[in-house]
């Protein structure tokens, strides 16, 4: 990962950054490169959040079968999906990459705090004061961005 300029990020409309945060970027080639990135992160738990249309909510529910998840309706055809996992899962990684590649918003938060709301007012709140790392995709999933935390294997 390399430090990137905030002005080079195309999808900041869904992200609420703090002025002093450093953004790291990594180019993604395909779903496998995303899985390797995810598997290389050090964490105890990872929160997955997706903003998508109703047509993909059922698919997400199938991929997360056996895991607790929450779905909130944001607009007529837009939903916020949230789940917490203990480790990287190849099938879930493939599906998340697919959603990101068609420009659904996919966010990952390592070691989230139970009392924090990371998504509010239609934006991902980049709250990293407890050591969390916030990760999101560029449009078309060509890059992945990360702020916070220092640990990447």
Curated annotation (Swiss-Prot):
It comes from the Bacteria. This is Uncharacterized protein YxiK. The gene is yxiK.
